[in-house]
Amino acid sequence: MCIRDSARVLHGGRIDVGDSLKLISTRKLRAGIITASDKGSKGEREDESGPAIRRIIEKQGYEVVSQVVLSDDAEGLYREMVRLADEEDVDVVFTTGGTGFSPRDNTPEATMRAATRNAPGIAEAMRYYSLQITPRAMLSRAASVIRNRTLIVNLPGSPKAVKECLEAVLDTLAHGIRILREEDGECGNGTSLKK
């Protein structure tokens, strides 16, 4: 049995009802949030999705160290992703907006440019989950990648879709981030990557 993200398996065995567990505290995961919106960056539209991400992830114990609204300019988005990963050393960057078919939707391109490794399963899981709700989910070009030791995840632009996509992946992300950061081993086998 694996109790991901809230407990670590120290050795194999069985857990029965009534057994006690030793809880080992872990540090909060640090996140950056980038909203990609031409209108939002000019103050012509209120950002609702960035604050929605913040509310959801803070309830899950994340610490938000940066939250910005930028234009859909690919270069600016890329630079902020790199800054958050390389200078702020956040565990995860969540972006919202700029993942559709519009000529100004540049978030996936900026994300792929920032990548040192691909992590497509996260974006695929969000699309799969969202397709159960709307066929328009197939129009998402969202990407999910790794930059060194930071995960970067593109989310849709609407608060409703942000909530749905985070529901699909958030429980598993913390485990993946801890493996990426070499703070945890594979789930269920009691190993640690740090020796």
Task: List where the protein language model places each region.
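Non-catalytic beta/alpha edge segments that cap or flank active sites
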Residues: 4-195
